[in-house]
Swiss-Prot record:
Protein name: Glutamate-1-semialdehyde 2,1-aminomutase
Statement: the UniProt record of this protein carries the keyword Isomerase: yes
GO CC term (a single one): cytoplasm
Subunit relationships: Homodimer.
Top class in the EC scheme: isomerase
UniProt organism field: Aeromonas salmonicida (strain A449)
Modified residues (N6-(pyridoxal phosphate)lysine): K265
EC number: 5.4.3.8
Pfam families named among the record's database cross-references: Aminotran_3
GO molecular function: glutamate-1-semialdehyde 2,1-aminomutase activity; pyridoxal phosphate binding; transaminase activity
Length: 428
């Protein structure tokens, strides 16, 4: 029995399911999750001493790779001063200014402790600002585990939302309308029926929780137009895409001007932190300047701010995103070519430092319902073949993959050689 096996068994005695976030349990692929001992550069190292080329990157924030020396030094320096004060600090001011400098739509910024806090707070602010209750989200998009967001579509196209988790009251869910990602007609229909009651649209500009699905041309622009027409706010959930698909995130990549933006752990270089921000006229409605309440004892934590500020400074170096885009394209196109060589149907999506692959005959994947039709059993087999080869992919067919700037020729060549052997076994 491996040490990971032992730890998983031990963990299940005191931690529900043996993990502190469900996807880590390997329910989507079967088997025992690998317990990680440490990470460096493009690699994870498990408790049994196995090294893996990492394509999760803590679900996105490790853009510079693990254990970056400059970020580590900044964290150590901050820790030597203290861990938490419960009072304002200079570094949180510098961090907010840096975010505003890079992402101009975020005229004012409020730090929080997670992506879930960011989206939950942004939605509360949108409701308070507009005086409306309903929100629009999209099937297959994930915005954290707040009650109003754990909602699925009802049985009809325009029925009110239904809870998709026990513990979410139906009275909460009824205020959430679920539309089809990349389908403006479904959004227009929702606004035609409920437009005067809708406070906001919240959307992942690149959907990263139905694998990786970029917006079709005109989709994000159409959402902006609809929001303007009906007086609703547009919230871009950039927890995954922020500073990843471009320096200015997806809003910079696609040239979209949102009212509010949410960010996650990438602004802490992987530490537990988040933020939301947007137009000053909207952000002024947040306490203490406005009536919409939001607070957090650990918000603006100085250690997380030190890590994040250092990372954002490093990302300003010219040419980094061109390098990242080229690395991602090389991996994605290499996977596609290796699958084709062995007659394995595979569709590939990628943008910036994100990618996704789908075992399907459909040449283009643009909607959630297409993802649900993919060959999940083949994905599970491929996942474990790659894991045995020392390549750590997301353990779910519904999660995106991420590259870092630490992925070099050696790591990419190893990955594609492993994929070649794995596809050969799948075809055999």
């Amino acid at each position: 029995m491996s040490k990971s096996d032992q730890l998983f068994e031990q963990a299940r005695q005191t931690i529900p399911g043996g993990v502190n976030s469900p996807v880590r349990a390997f329910n989507g692929v079967g088997g025992t999750p690998r317990f990680i001992d440490h990470a460096d550069g493009a690699y994870l190292y498990d408790v049994d001493g196995q090294a893996y080329v990492d394509y999760i990157g803590s679900w996105g924030p490790m853009l510079l790779g693990h254990n970056h020396p400059a970020i580590k030094a900044a964290v150590i320096k901050a820790v030597e001063k203290g861990l938490s004060y419960g009072a304002p600090t200079e570094i949180e001011v510098l961090m907010a200014e840096k975010v505003r400098q890079i992402v101009p739509s975020m005229e004012q910024v409020r730090m929080v402790n997670s992506g879930t806090e960011a989206t939950m707070s942004a939605i509360r602010l949108a409701r308070g600002y507009t005086g409306r209750d309903k929100i629009v989200k999209f099937e297959g998009c994930y915005h954290g585990h707040a009650d109003s967001l754990l909602v699925k579509a009802g049985s009809g196209a325009l029925t009110l939302g239904q809870p998709n988790s026990p513990g979410v009251p139906a009275d909460f869910a009824k205020h959430t309308l679920t539309c089809v990602f990349n389908d403006l007609d479904s959004v227009r229909e929702a606004f035609t029926q409920y437009g005067c009651d809708i406070a906001c649209i919240i959307v992942e500009p690149v959907a990263g929780n139905m694998n990786c699905i970029p917006p079709v041309p005109g989709f994000l622009e159409g959402l902006r137009t609809i929001c303007d027409e009906f007086g609703a706010l547009l919230i871009l959930d950039e927890v995954m895409t922020g500073f990843r698909v471009s320096l200015r995130g997806a809003q910079g990549y696609y040239n979209i001007d949102p009212d509010l933006t949410t960010l996650g752990k990438i602004i802490g270089a992987g530490m537990p932190v988040g933020a939301f921000g947007g137009k000053k006229k909207v952000m002024q409605h947040i306490a203490p300047t406005g009536p919409v309440y939001q607070a957090g004892t650990l918000s603006g934590n100085p250690v997380a701010m030190a890590a994040g500020l250092t990372m954002l400074d490093l990302l300003l170096e010219p040419g980094l995103y061109e390098q990242l885009n080229a690395k991602t394209a090389r991996v994605a196109e290499g996977l596609k070519a290796a699958a084709a060589k062995h007659g394995i149907p595979l569709a590939i999506n990628y943008v910036g430092g994100m990618f996704g692959f789908f075992f399907t005959d459909e040449p283009e994947i643009t909607r959630y319902e297409q993802v649900t039709r993919c060959d999940m059993e083949r994905f599970k087999r491929f996942y474990h073949l790659m894991l045995e080869e020392g390549v750590y992919l997301a353990p779910s067919a519904y999660e995106a993959g991420f590259l870092s700037l630490a992925h070099g020729d050696k790591e990419i060549e190893h990955t594609l050689a492993a994929a070649e052997r794995s596809f050969a076994k799948l075809a055999g």
